[in-house]
């Protein structure tokens, strides 16, 4: 998501907003997975992250917001894109970026998804598996970031 968001923002000549759990973990000098476990116990972490992202996006005339919840958080966005990939594909990407074992990354990905789905439902009443809020849903499996950006650009309405 970050790579696609960055490339898309560059292509459109607009800022890219992408404040993430990883960045919050770094701010707090915490391991990412420990921070995720903390977020599962403290709903204020999600609220802070999402508030900060929305504030950053609203401060821009136009931007690309790279966020797991962007299609639900920015109701008035001109165009909402949801990128999806299988658990295995996402685990492969994390493994390539961070190392470890692929099996461990797959288990962590599935565990995180389960916790995220439960948390988003509890905090916001959002079913993050329901992509009906999106204008465009792309299965990223087997596609390069540039291919995905090209698909988004092709689907953008003329007024965006």
Which residue stretches match the model-derived regions?
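Short loop/helix-cap segments at secondary-structure boundaries that form the rim of catalytic
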Residues: 71-77, 129-132
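C-terminal alpha-helix
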Residues: 151-159
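ATP-dependent small-molecule kinase phosphotransfer cores
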Residues: 15-74, 88, 99-107, 114
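Small-molecule kinase domains that catalyze NTP-dependent phosphoryl transfer to phosphate-bearing small molecules
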Residues: 102-151
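Glycine-rich phosphate-binding P-loop
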Residues: 1-8
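Acidic donor-binding loop at a coil-to-helix junction in glycosyltransferase catalytic cores
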Residues: 90-95
């Amino acid at each position: 998501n970050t790579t696609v968001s960055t490339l898309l923002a560059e292509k459109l000549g607009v800022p890219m907003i992408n404040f993430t759990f990883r960045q919050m973990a770094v701010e707090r000098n915490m391991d990412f997975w420990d921070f995720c476990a903390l977020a599962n116990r403290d709903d204020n972490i999600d609220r802070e992250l999402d508030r900060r992202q929305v504030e950053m996006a609203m401060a821009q005339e136009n931007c690309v917001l790279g966020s797991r919840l962007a299609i639900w958080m920015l109701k008035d966005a001109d165009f909402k894109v949801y990128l999806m990939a299988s658990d295995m594909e996402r685990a492969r990407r994390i493994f390539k970026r961070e190392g470890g074992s692929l099996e461990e990354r797959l288990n962590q990905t599935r565990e995180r998804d389960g916790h995220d789905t439960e948390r988003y439902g509890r905090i916001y009443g959002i079913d993050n598996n329901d992509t009906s809020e999106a204008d465009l849903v792309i299965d990223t499996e087997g596609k390069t970031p540039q291919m995905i950006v090209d698909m988004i650009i092709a689907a953008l309405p003329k007024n965006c």
